[in-house]
């Protein structure tokens, strides 16, 4: 798998994958329409691509997923806005591979932060499996953080 900044020509494909991926959240406790903001918006994804926040996951020349990432000003903390894999490729280890690539994408990152809905048992288990520690929670979200080893930076 390759993780690279999204190409404008792939935005429609990335949005379609995002829509399919987040629409599957119904099967893990989400309500209909309980998806991330703008998950199905071409304009929003174009903006994320233009600002350098949208990445595409490519396997055998096919876009299979994406990530929205935000690096803080000093380059030490990476915020994962979202990651997604096309449901046609679920249960193949692509999500695990994508997150491991995200963790090493920006040199110098010391920690990664993200949040996920409390009701989404799939993503909460996924991030815990990857070594993310729950820092706090509110009525809707669990907030996770992972400190990266110096040898991985």
Question: Could you tell me what each predicted segment is?
Answer:
Residues 2-16:
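A short beta-loop-alpha structural element at the N-terminal edge
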Residues 19-44:
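Conserved GNAT-fold acetyl-CoA-binding loop/helix
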Residues 42-56:
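A short helix-loop-beta-strand connector motif used in the catalytic cores of GNAT acetyltransferases and
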Residues 56, 62-71, 77-79, 84:
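Conserved beta-strand in the GNAT
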Residues 83-90, 116-117:
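A short, internal acetyl-CoA/4′-phosphopantetheine-binding micro-motif in the GNAT/acyltransferase core
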Residues 89, 93-101:
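Conserved acetyl-CoA pyrophosphate-binding loop and the N-cap/start of the following alpha-helix
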Residues 96-97, 118-137:
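Conserved active-site alpha-helix within GNAT-family acetyltransferase domains
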Residues 99, 106-118:
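Conserved GNAT acetyl-CoA-binding A-motif
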